[in-house]
């Protein structure tokens, strides 16, 4: 009887925890570690509180993804020159996001690839998408066999490079893994007019899985006007945006302003600063750090 009571108690607590988790009405927040371009930085940023990272991807003249590299200039207070070969970084990232791996970081649930397509001609965008997909499929998703589990956002700086999205999707389909597009989202990062961004997605045939970024280097100031426009689109009921993130946010006051505006993600050089603000009395009952169970393509409903 005692054993039965103990089992019942454990089951009751588990059920209560599950109900409480589903009943949590706080907005999930993605704390996005900025400019994570060396494998060693993955652990560094996650250990500081990031549940997602942003990684720069440079391309060679033939539209092959080549390095995880930003270069000069970059954010104030950061080294701009850390890098890896792209495929080596993907392997390190796979280790960090594959359950059971010795390097596994359970908190790391989303990766934004900041695609530096400015070096490419417009007519290379589709090919860049195909080559990016082939590399991710082999080195990150392990050809669909127990690869990394993180969600991926393809962030494109130029609206004219929307064919990259189709190239990426077509390549995964060609290689027999169209289901992996369930793990892929999209972002145009050039701070273009929201309407123009929407038109680019129409041309690309994309509806859903849309993150909208807004921001500027931490060396400069930028207001929240466009962030609020993106949030209005997200919350309109008929907009194309699912999530909004703001970059680069390093100060507590800026973090509070972004949270007050209603963002879903904050990209930062200092994840611990964002974590501290989320734990403040004014925010801890409204926001929480997103977990893997939070769908990054789902528009949060209050």
Curated annotation (Swiss-Prot):
Its EC number is 4.6.1.-. The active site is at residues 34, 70. Glycans are attached at residue 279. It is an enzyme of class 4 (lyase). Mg(2+) binds at residues 54, 56, 114. It catalyses: an N-(acyl)-sphingosylphosphocholine = an N-(acyl)-sphingosyl-1,3-cyclic phosphate + choline; an N-(acyl)-sphingosylphosphoethanolamine = an N-(acyl)-sphingosyl-1,3-cyclic phosphate + ethanolamine; a 1-acyl-sn-glycero-3-phosphocholine = a 1-acyl-sn-glycero-2,3-cyclic phosphate + choline; a 1-acyl-sn-glycero-3-phosphoethanolamine = a 1-acyl-sn-glycero-2,3-cyclic phosphate + ethanolamine. This is Dermonecrotic toxin LiSicTox-alphaIA2bii.
């Amino acid at each position: 009887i005692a054993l039965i009571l103990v089992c019942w108690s454990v089951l009751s607590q588990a059920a209560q925890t599950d109900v409480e988790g589903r009943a949590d009405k706080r907005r999930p927040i993605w704390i996005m570690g900025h400019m994570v371009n060396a494998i060693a930085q993955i652990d560094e940023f996650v250990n500081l509180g990031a549940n997602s990272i942003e990684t720069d991807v440079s391309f060679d003249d033939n539209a092959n993804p080549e390095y995880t590299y930003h270069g000069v200039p970059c954010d104030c207070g950061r080294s701009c020159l850390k890098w890896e070969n792209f495929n080596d970084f993907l392997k390190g990232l796979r280790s960090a996001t594959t359950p059971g791996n010795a390097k596994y970081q359970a908190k790391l649930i989303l990766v934004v690839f900041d695609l530096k397509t400015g070096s490419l001609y417009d007519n290379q965008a589709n090919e860049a998408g195909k080559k990016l997909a082939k590399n991710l499929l082999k080195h990150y998703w392990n050809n669909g066999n127990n690869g990394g589990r993180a969600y991926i956002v393809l962030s494109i700086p130029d609206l004219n490079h929307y064919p990259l999205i189709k190239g990426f999707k077509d390549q995964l389909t060609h290689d027999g893994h169209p289901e992996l597009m369930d793990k892929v989202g999209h972002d145009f990062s050039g701070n273009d007019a929201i309407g123009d961004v929407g038109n680019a997605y129409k041309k690309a045939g994309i509806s859903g899985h849309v993150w909208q970024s807004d921001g500027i280097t931490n060396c400069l100031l930028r207001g929240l006007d466009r962030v609020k426009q993106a949030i209005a689109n997200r919350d309109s009921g008929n907009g194309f945006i699912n999530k909004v993130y703001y970059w680069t946010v390093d100060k507590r006051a800026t973090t509070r302003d972004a949270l007050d505006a209603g963002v879903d993600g904050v990209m930062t050089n200092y994840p611990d600063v964002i974590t501290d603000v989320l734990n403040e009395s004014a925010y801890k009952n409204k926001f929480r750090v997103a977990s893997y169970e939070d769908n990054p393509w789902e528009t949060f409903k209050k």
